[in-house]
Regions:
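Short, low-complexity, intrinsically disordered N-terminal peptides in bacterial proteins
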Residues: 1-9
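Structural signal for interior beta-strand "rungs" in well-ordered beta-sheet cores
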Residues: 9-154
Length: 154
């Protein structure tokens, strides 16, 4: 990875679109793919093989582990290609192979709050709202429009 303090540390095999907005302290691992509408905040670490696509805003100090996919089209028959997004807050841990879909509905968002610990192979579907300080265990799946309030354990 490059060592320039003025630019994110991006592994040479990662594909980062030139329009993506990454804070200078972001680290991007091998073979990650980051699309043009992605914004990543200060101190976030993106692991290998991560895909961030579509309109995605990720806050500060998140740890995004290998194989995570954020911002893919929703798995919803009502989705017609309308612009929607994923918003991830600060200080979250997303373990291996977590998948978070964009929302259905123009301007709608799938939201993940702050300080959540989402274990491996968790699916967060379209239009979900996750508060803060939540733990979701390995292999859990949240269907579309699920709301999880602060402090929940699933």
């Amino acid at each position: 990875m490059s060592e320039d303090a003025q630019h994110p540390r991006i592994h040479p095999t990662a594909l980062v679109h030139p329009q993506a907005r990454l804070h200078p302290t972001v680290q991007v691992g091998p073979y990650a793919v980051i699309g043009p509408q992605v914004e990543v905040g200060e101190g976030t670490v993106i692991g290998p093989y991560v895909v961030l696509d579509g309109q995605v805003r990720i806050g500060r100090r998140n740890r995004i582990h290998a194989g995570v996919v954020i911002g893919c089209e929703p798995q919803d028959r009502n989705f017609r290609g309308e612009p929607s997004s994923v918003v991830v807050g600060d200080d979250n841990v997303l373990r291996e192979y977590v998948q978070i879909s964009r929302a259905t509905g123009e301007g709608a968002a799938t939201v993940v709050g702050d300080r959540n610990y989402i274990m491996s192979m968790v699916h967060v579907a379209h239009n979900c709202y996750l508060g803060s300080d939540i733990v979701i265990v390995t292999g859990s799946g949240l269907a579309g429009y699920v709301r999880v309030d602060d402090g929940a354990q699933i």
